[in-house]
């Protein structure tokens, strides 16, 4: 009897706990569902019962504030567009022309008539051009060419164009087949006689003398 009573009490306790757990679980789920439904319904009701005055007072594209801001921005843009670019263009043009005249004449750059017209002191610049180094195919026309080439060393096959600078060739180094002056050549030949060792050297000496005499006559012409 005591055992039966003990088993019954245990069963009743277990059933009671299960029932309480199920009831709590069902209550919590139902509460969550009702809460979500209430929120959705509240939003729907707010949309339905929204006042018409709020809709009319909303900002639109024709409001006074928007028109005021738009007019100010358009006026600012027009004001900046009306500014003239003439001073800046003149500055850039002068900046592009003046350094071209101050730089050495290189890479085949020539003095153009446009630069002469745009720069008032172009004559002074043209006079200073012969003092610049002759590099990369720079060429000078007319008198400046003759005057500047007489002061330059004779290198890389530079030819003797006129008799204007023949006298200055004595001071230049003897390079690339340049021949000395006739008086100097005669003096060197008389003051430094060659010592002959064999007839072949004698013939070579005579050939060299004949060549120098021929070149000397060409220079004097």
Swiss-Prot record:
Assigned keywords, A-Z:
Amidation, Cleavage on pair of basic residues, Neuropeptide, Secreted, Signal
The leader peptide range reads 1-25
> Where does this polypeptide localize?
Secreted
The Swiss-Prot or TrEMBL record describes its family as follows:
Belongs to the FARP (FMRFamide related peptide) family.
- One Gene Ontology cellular component annotation held by this UniProt entry: extracellular region
Tissue expression, as annotated, is: Observed in the suprachiasmatic nucleus and in several telencephalic and diencephalic regions.
Q: What is the lineage of its organism?
A: Eukaryota, Metazoa, Chordata, Craniata, Vertebrata
**The protein's role, per its UniProt record:** Primary role is to release GH from the pituitary. May act as an endogenous ligand in the bullfrog hypothalamo-hypophysial system.
**PTM Phenylalanine amide: at which residues?**
107, 136, 156, 176
Q: Which residues form the propeptide?
A: 26-95, 110-127, 179-221
The protein depicted here goes by the name Growth hormone-releasing peptides
User: Which BP terms from GO are recorded?
Assistant: hormone secretion; negative regulation of gonadotropin secretion; neuropeptide signaling pathway
Q: Which GO terms describe its molecular function?
A: signaling receptor binding
């Amino acid at each position: 009897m005591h055992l039966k009573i003990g088993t019954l009490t245990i069963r009743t306790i277990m059933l009671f706990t299960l029932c309480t757990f199920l009831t709590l679980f069902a209550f919590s789920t139902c509460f969550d569902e009702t809460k979500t439904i209430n929120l959705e319904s509240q939003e729907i009701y707010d949309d339905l019962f929204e006042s018409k005055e709020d809709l009319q007072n909303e900002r639109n594209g024709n409001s006074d504030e928007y028109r005021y801001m738009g007019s100010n921005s358009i006026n600012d843009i027009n004001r900046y567009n009306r500014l003239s670019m003439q001073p800046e263009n003149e500055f850039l043009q002068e900046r592009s022309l003046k350094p071209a005249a101050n730089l050495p004449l290189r890479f085949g750059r020539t003095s153009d008539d446009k630069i002469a017209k745009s720069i008032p002191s172009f004559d002074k610049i043209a006079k200073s051009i012969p003092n610049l180094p002759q590099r990369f195919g720079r060429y000078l026309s007319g008198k400046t060419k003759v005057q500047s080439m007489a002061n330059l060393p004779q290198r890389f096959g530079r030819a003797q164009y006129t008799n204007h600078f023949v006298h200055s060739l004595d001071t230049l180094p003897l390079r690339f087949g340049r021949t000395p002056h006739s008086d100097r050549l005669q003096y060197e030949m008389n003051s430094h006689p060659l010592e002959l060792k064999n007839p072949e050297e004698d013939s070579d000496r005579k050939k060299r003398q004949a060549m120098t005499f021929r070149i000397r006559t060409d220079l004097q012409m």
